[in-house]
């Protein structure tokens, strides 16, 4: 961000002396946004008091407020914005009783945040980077030419300070707005999944893909221009090494290099974090689908009942006679006495026993990884485990293997965004797609 020439105590004393304060409830903020929108349609960039009252009337109607006291409330709102230095009021003897109003830099900054800065544009970013590249190239050429202190201030320091640094701050602000938009998208996805996740799958996919595409476009644009920008900054830095009186230029170049590194680094980190969130949402949807298989019949039955009068149907059901237990309640029977000894092919193995065996196998694989540094290959583990069970149990066993392995750790290759190779896990065509888990 921009540097501050004042210290913290000086800034605090300055704010206290001038009695700075901002209070913008939703109706006041809406009024300010309405003023900014209407002001943008005017070439002169100024508005009369009557136009402000008309804008306030639109806001009052939207909030369903009474229209009887609209003039008084509009006057109070205008005075409040003037007091908070969001509007400037200009009066003269010629236009007495009909003042002219203009938005202050603070008012423009607030409205820009809510209106214009939220519109991400790759073309806008490309133009900003193109302007920065041109300014840096001219500054680097001027630095290599050399000259007196006035030459360095006018042709090197000034473009870097008042053009390049401000555009870097604008790009940094765009990234921070993108961070906030990601949180809003996450909230939207959470609300969709909580209401009706089946109907929300397509909407979630759209939100995920749009955000991923926007982040990728932003990062690709930064990567394409980042190397050239750093090269020109290095040219300026090399030119200042032989001069002891250019420490102010050297410090500014160092700050710009840090800003550029932070922008590019955070862009890539934001993509990696979003990829992890994308995988988390898809895993949740897959788990919900697996758990909801038994509800398919119930959902179809409800739909059939709702459309009965349009598409009548007949229901056939069987009601068998109840079996009465004629045994003595106090007589305790053993399984061996009732069923006899079961053949080996008919032995029953509980689900919990399978999970315990799986946990033991995964634990053994993990021990090998820790001792010898061998990554955990999910395809190999699943194949070895499925070989111990008949074909009819392969699906359930494979799902348990995957769930347990995912709980152990992650694969660093997942963050690259590249798909893993399909690996066969049995002799009947079943395959698994997963990177090698190498981070626990």
Curated annotation (Swiss-Prot):
Q: Which CDD domains match?
A: MukF_C, MukF_N
- Please tell me one Gene Ontology term that the record gives under cellular component: cytoplasm
Predominant subcellular localization, coarse grouping? cytoplasm
A single MF term (Gene Ontology) = calcium ion binding
Mind listing the UniProt keywords for this protein, alphabetically? Answer: Calcium, Cell cycle, Cell division, Chromosome partition, Cytoplasm, DNA condensation
- Region (Leucine-zipper) spans which residues? 208-236
Under Pfam families, the record lists: KicB, MukF_C, MukF_M
User: Subunit structure of this entry?
Assistant: Interacts, and probably forms a ternary complex, with MukE and MukB via its C-terminal region. The complex formation is stimulated by calcium or magnesium. It is required for an interaction between MukE and MukB.
- Protein's name in the database: Chromosome partition protein MukF
Species name = Klebsiella pneumoniae subsp. pneumoniae (strain ATCC 700721 / MGH 78578)
Q: What is the lineage of its organism?
A: Bacteria, Pseudomonadati, Pseudomonadota, Gammaproteobacteria, Enterobacterales
């Amino acid at each position: 961000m921009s540097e501050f020439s004042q210290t913290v105590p000086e800034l605090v004393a300055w704010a206290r002396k001038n009695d700075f304060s901002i209070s913008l409830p939703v109706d006041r903020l809406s009024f300010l946004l309405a003023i900014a929108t209407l002001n943008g349609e005017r070439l002169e960039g100024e508005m009369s008091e009557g136009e402000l009252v008309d804008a306030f009337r639109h806001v009052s109607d939207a909030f369903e407020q009474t229209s009887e006291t609209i003039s008084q409330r509009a006057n109070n709102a205008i005075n409040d914005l003037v007091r908070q230095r969001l509007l400037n009021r200009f009066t003269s003897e010629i236009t007495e009783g009909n003042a002219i109003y203009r938005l202050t830099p603070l008012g423009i900054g607030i409205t820009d945040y809510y209106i214009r800065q939220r519109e991400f544009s790759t073309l806008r970013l490309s133009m900003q980077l193109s302007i920065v590249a041109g300014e840096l190239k001219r500054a680097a050429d001027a630095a290599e030419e050399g000259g007196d202190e006035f030459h360095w201030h006018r042709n090197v320091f000034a473009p870097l300070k008042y053009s390049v640094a401000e555009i870097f701050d604008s790009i940094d602000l765009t990234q921070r707005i993108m961070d906030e938009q990601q949180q809003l998208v996450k909230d939207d996805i959470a609300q969709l999944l909580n209401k009706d996740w089946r109907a929300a799958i397509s909407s979630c996919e759209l939100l995920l893909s749009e955000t991923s595409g926007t982040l990728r476009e932003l990062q690709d644009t930064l990567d394409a221009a980042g190397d050239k920008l750093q090269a020109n900054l290095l040219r300026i830095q090399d030119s200042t090494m032989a001069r002891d009186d250019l420490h102010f230029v050297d410090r500014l170049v160092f700050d710009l290099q840090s800003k550029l590194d932070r922008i590019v680094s955070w862009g890539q980190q934001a993509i990696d974090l979003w990829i992890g969130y994308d995988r988390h949402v898809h895993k949740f949807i897959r788990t919900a689908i697996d758990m909801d298989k038994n509800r398919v019949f119930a959902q179809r039955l409800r739909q059939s009942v709702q459309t009965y009068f349009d598409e009548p149907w007949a229901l056939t059901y069987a009601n068998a006679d109840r079996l009465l237990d004629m045994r003595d309640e106090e007589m305790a029977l053993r399984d061996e006495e009732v069923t006899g000894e079961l053949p080996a092919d008919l032995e029953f193995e509980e689900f919990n026993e399978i999970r315990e065996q799986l946990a033991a196998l995964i634990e053994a694989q993990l021990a090998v990884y820790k001792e010898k540094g061998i990554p955990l290959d999910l395809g190999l583990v699943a194949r070895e485990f499925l070989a111990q069970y008949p074909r009819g149990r392969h699906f359930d066993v494979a799902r348990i293997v995957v769930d347990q392995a995912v709980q152990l750790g992650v694969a660093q290759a997942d963050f690259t965004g590249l798909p893993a190779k399909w690996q066969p896990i049995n002799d009947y065509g079943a395959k698994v797609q997963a990177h090698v888990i190498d981070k626990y």
